Amino acid sequence: MIDPLQASVRIATSGLDAQSTRLRIVAENLANANATAKAAGAEPYRRKTVTFDAAVDSTIGARLVNVKEFGVDSSPYRVEYDPGHPAANENGYVKLPNVNMLVEMADMRETNRSYEANLQVVKQVRSMAAMLIDLLRGT
Amino acid sequence: MLESLALSTLNTIGDSLRTRQVQTSALTPASAATQPASATATAFDSVMGQLAKEAVTTLKAGEAASIAGLQGRASAQQVVEAMMSAERSLQLAISVRDKVVQAYQELTRMAI
């Protein structure tokens, strides 16, 4: 039986890890927001998504969050008229990645908030553990 | 786990106090008194040794995690978690040690 405070830290850390991975995906989407194909009519970058899953950790007997899988967003690509582009099709249209900057920014903010919340749990655990140990210090 | 260790430490101190009380109230001869006194000394030694071992184990885990982090094998979050756990164990070990030493000093100052 593990100390519940220690288990809380472990769980919060899994949350921190998960949100870090999520931020990585957001960064990838943002960086590739204008990554078009090289050849005419080929597919550009497709927006990636990340899904989380609750997995039971038998050593602490609690559910940790971990990354279930990386998926792809199947929404249609943005299309822009640019006949001079190497990836333009016969009608002069270029397919751009289906990355929406606003959506990515909102996702990033949410990631940040969730990370903060998990970090707050860690801080709380530290303060509670310190309070407990301080009981021994007092004369 | 360490909390239970601390509790057992305090219990041991209580036991040793009780042994001393029995010794002083019974006014046993010096030859007979050496036996329980040495038993308490061993208990004290083992408690302190166990405490140190516990603290060293968690500290080692923390160090291993930070080295893994430097080598890129562990995430920063995992390193922080391990270091926090090590810090907590060390703090607890130090507090318990202080308490035990204090109790021991209390015993040595006792007027017989």
Task: Give the role of each language-model region.
Chain A
Residues 1-139:
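Amphipathic alpha-helical polymerization modules
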